[in-house]
């Protein structure tokens, strides 16, 4: 599906928990018709301990949302 929304565009979220937010697009996933928007749909993800990060812990990461839930701002 062809989309007018590209990476680094400013978009407004029009549906979901983050409705009304204006933020930058971090990535566009054309195969699934989804976008990743900065600071929207943030989840807490557990990280297992590794050699680089011996304590493990949690990180906050943006999840993709459907492209129909955003419009260009």
From Swiss-Prot:
Per the record's keyword annotation, is Nucleotide-binding included, yes or no? no
Give GO cellular component annotations, separated by semicolons. Answer: ribonucleoprotein complex; ribosome
SMART domains xrefs: KOW
Any single GO BP term:
translation
The record's annotation in PANTHER family points to: MITOCHONDRIAL RIBOSOMAL PROTEIN L24
Bias (Basic and acidic residues) occurs at: 51-65
Which SUPFAM superfamilies does the entry link to? Translation proteins SH3-like domain
Which is one GO molecular function term here? rRNA binding
Q: What is this protein called?
A: Large ribosomal subunit protein uL24
Instruction: Name the keywords, alphabetized.
Output: Ribonucleoprotein, Ribosomal protein, RNA-binding, rRNA-binding
What quaternary structure, including any partners, is listed in this protein's UniProt entry? Part of the 50S ribosomal subunit.
Q: Respond yes or no to whether keyword Lyase is given for this record.
A: no
**InterPro entries listed in its UniProt record:** KOW, Rib_uL2_dom2, Ribosomal_uL24, Ribosomal_uL24_CS, Ribosomal_uL24_KOW, Translation_prot_SH3-like_sf
What protein family does this chain belong to?
A: Belongs to the universal ribosomal protein uL24 family.
What biological function has been recorded for the protein in this entry? Answer: One of two assembly initiator proteins, it binds directly to the 5'-end of the 23S rRNA, where it nucleates assembly of the 50S subunit. One of the proteins that surrounds the polypeptide exit tunnel on the outside of the subunit.
Q: Where is this region: Disordered?
A: 51-73
Family annotation (NCBIfam families): rplX_bact
């Amino acid at each position: 599906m062809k989309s007018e929304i590209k990476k680094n565009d400013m978009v407004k979220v029009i549906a979901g928990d983050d409705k009304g937010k204006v933020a930058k697009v971090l990535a566009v996933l054309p195969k699934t018709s989804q976008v990743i928007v900065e600071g929207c749909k943030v989840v807490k993800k557990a990280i297992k301990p590794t050699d680089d990060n011996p304590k493990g812990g949690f990180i906050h990461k943006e999840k993709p949302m459907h492209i129909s839930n955003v419009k260009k701002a």
